[in-house]
Amino acid sequence: MANKYFSSVLKSLLLLLHLVFLSKQHVDSASIVKFLPGFEGPLPFELETGYIGIGEEEEVQLFYYFIKSERNPKEDPLILWLTGGPGCSSISGLLFENGPLTMKLDVYNGTLPSLVSTTYSWTKTSSMIFLDQPVGTGFSYSRTQQFNKPSDSGEAKRIHEFLQKWLGKHQEFSSNPFYVAGDSYSGLVVPATVQEISKGNYECCNPPINLQGYVLGNPLTDYAIDSNSRIPFAHGMALISDELYESLKKTCKGEYTNVHPRNTQCLKFIEEFNKCTNRILQQLILDPLCETETPDCYIYRYLLTTYWANDATVREALQINKESIGEWVRCYRTIPYDNDIKSSMPYHVNNSISGYRSLIYSGDHDLEVPYLGTQAWIRSLNYSIIDDWRPWMIKNQIAGYTRTYANKMTFATIKGGGHTIEFKPEEASIMFQRWINGQPL
């Protein structure tokens, strides 16, 4: 009887140890993915997916997609891509903006949506990490309920920790030139992350990261400057009349966001402005505002991606932990989060003093974060201009306009572009390749 009891206890202990081992094995796990459901044949590039544990107990598990450069991964730059939101999966970058795959826009018929290769991937000349952050975004999750609520400044620290651990497990990339990139809301997080990495390079006891600079597209940078640029932008794009614009300027005096409740005249004209623009697609004012998700609407790809990412065979191929999350959503709009950085301009200044390169680009038909606001905050930094406003060309056609500053900052517009580069991926790719290779746009 005693032997039976001892045997039972021993089996239970062994099972417990096995489960603990599996749990520890999953932390910082990584898998090479050679085939993806929906894509015909083997992948024509090297894809790795995995989790990196963050925090003292590694309670936060951040999921990433890593794609090696198709040119020379031993020497090419390493780019960390952060999608905006906060709470939007980095799959938005991978499948819609600058990755080697995208969704095939077929009408959904109940079967798994298809993936096809792109011609504009940034991985042609750079290795890229697409990171799902903050926790709760994409396939990233927490193993417990005990973790600090994500915030802008907190994410800069978590991302830095992620990079230290990731590079510790991928030491062959530790000497590659490293850049942080992102768009939209990442305009607040990326500059803070760059500063955090820079500071960490001078502290004990981790190897320094070969940080060279950062890239930002239509970046939310300063709430006041960016939001107050929408009305001048709308006027310049003929969305509102001269008379309404003059009335807005006169009564609101440049403050269109935090209007005093007693300023009824300003509020009245802002209501008129909203009536003129509420049926405009803010991300790209040239495109129709879709009523339904149909294949001719740009958001249809988001629907297809949701079906794809929630398919069991896809999750198995990506090696997603079954206990991580329930339904995958592209953007977790109600994610618990503290927006504690109201302006990232001080971070830009500090990063500039530290000598880092930066490329700031704007799709010039974005009403959400208009290029006028981006130009305004760059202008307020009072950097000397070394290459003044000029067109940049693709095949003898104007693709946008650019200006270069003495602090290694390059600003560029993408003609006809929107809030993200999914609207002009080919042009954005050429712009990026020139900049990352040290060539003038």
From Swiss-Prot:
The UniProt record lists the keyword Endoplasmic reticulum: no
UniProt EC number: 3.4.16.-
GO BP terms in the entry: proteolysis
Cysteine disulfide links: C88-C331, C252-C266, C290-C297
A molecular function GO annotation: serine-type carboxypeptidase activity
InterPro entries, sorted: AB_hydrolase_fold, Peptidase_S10
Known tissue expression: Expressed in seedlings and roots.
First and last residue of the signal peptide: 1-29
Coiled-coil intervals, chain numbering: none
Protein's name according to its UniProt entry: Serine carboxypeptidase-like 2
Species this protein is from: Arabidopsis thaliana
Phylogenetic lineage: Eukaryota, Viridiplantae, Streptophyta, Embryophyta, Tracheophyta
